[in-house]
Curated annotation (Swiss-Prot):
This is Non-specific lipid-transfer protein C4. Disulfide bonds join 34-72, 44-59, 60-85, 70-92. It comes from Oryza sativa subsp. japonica (Rice). Keywords: Disulfide bond, Glycoprotein, Lipid-binding, Signal. Lipid-transfer protein that may be regulated by the transcription factor UDT1 in developing anthers and play a role in tapetum development.
Length: 94
């Protein structure tokens, strides 16, 4: 059961990354350059679940290759998801 939940979480994370890439492209303003950068983050999907070990070298390389503009755009899109889905903002502070 735990492995199933882990696989589901990894799949959900991968889906979010792909959606962010598509969203960045749809927003225009050079978003097309972000798509390949964000797609490379799929190498990080195993790390993006609670309890994961250290990220792989491939993940770290992918993360280091993302431009600041693409990273900020992806974070902005991710932060807007709850309100766009008519949900409360997620507060992760303790």
């Amino acid at each position: 059961m735990a492995a199933s939940k882990g696989n589901a979480a990894a799949a959900a994370c991968a889906l979010v990354l792909v959606l962010l890439a598509v969203g960045a492209e749809a927003q225009g303003g050079g978003g097309g350059e972000c798509v390949p950068q964000l797609n490379r983050l799929l190498a990080c999907r195993a790390y993006a679940v609670p309890g994961a070990g250290d990220p792989s070298a491939e993940c770290c390389s992918a993360l280091s290759s993302i431009s600041q503009g693409c990273a900020c755009s992806a974070i902005s899109i991710m932060n807007s998801l709850p309100s766009r889905c008519h949900l409360s903002q997620i507060n992760c502070s303790a």
